[in-house]
Amino acid sequence: GSCTASLTGSAVVTVTNDPTSTISANTICSGQTGTLTFTGTPGAEVLFTDGVSNFTVTLDASGNATFTTVALTADTTYTLISATTVTPPATASLTASATVVVVGLPTATISGTTSICSGSTTTISFSGTAGAVVTYTINAGANQTITLDASGNATLTTPALTADTTYALVSVALGSCSQNQTGSALVTILPLPTASISGTTTICSGTTTTISFSGTANATVTYTVDSGAPQTIVLDAAGNATLTTPILTAPSTYALVSVASMSVPVCTST
């Protein structure tokens, strides 16, 4: 005959999902570090590369992780390679990527070094990154700002200056990116020339006398005789000049009109 026995038992096949991860990156200013953000299977070890070196991060219990890059000066792409879990043991190939976008730092320069006559104005020019805000000082005073236009230029007209004045760059900023800047423009002030006249006297009709001028060395003095046409005389290196009048038979007035320096630019006083 045949024998029959009843049996019991089972086999359980557990199917687990492959580990996963996503990657994202931020935008930074040149010279800063970037931040990569990973999200995926809790506990997974994520392998990724920048095309030169490989790196790993482990996702926390919430499935998140961040990674700080080295300081970057150019856009850099990071690509996922794989995600691996220990329990259960599994590895999945990944291909997603994210790029840390690097924004170049703004720049600025300053120009306008010149010499002007005391009491005059001049123009200081700035150039650099379009739209940037340039911070500068005047004679190391409080910070002031000027914004570059769409062409990357800006100018300012100084007030009337009577002493040497230095306009110096401090920094430049555009959005969240900024850096210190160096450079300056020196406005040198040339003193106004001076002149005086002497020689008031009484003489006998038909005689001559001497008129004396003094003032800034080498300056050109303009004067009139009895309100006539302007005439000039040049002071010597000691700042002096004299002239002998013609024979006079009536009172005569010698009057100063102006004095001009030999400097560049020429400075004039009246």
Language model segments and positions:
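Short, solvent-exposed loop/linker segments at the N-terminal edge
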Residues: N26-Q32, T114-S120, T201-T207
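Solvent-exposed loop segments of extracellular immunoglobulin-like
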Residues: P42-L47, A130-Y136, A217-Y223
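A short beta-strand segment in extracellular, disulfide-stabilized domains
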Residues: Q32-T39, T121-S127, T208-S214
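Conserved structural position at the C-terminal beta-strand
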Residues: S82-A83, S171-V172, S258-V259
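Short, exposed coil/turn segments at beta-strand boundaries within extracellular/luminal domains
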Residues: S2-L7, C29, V86-T95, C117, ...
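Proline-enriched interdomain boundary motifs that mark the N-terminal boundary
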Residues: N17-A25, G104-G112, P191-G199
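Interdomain boundary/hinge segments at the C-termini of tandem beta-sandwich modules
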Residues: A11-N17, A98-G104, A185-P191
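Solvent-exposed segments in extracellular or luminal domains encompassing
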Residues: L59-Y78, T147-Y167, V234-Y254
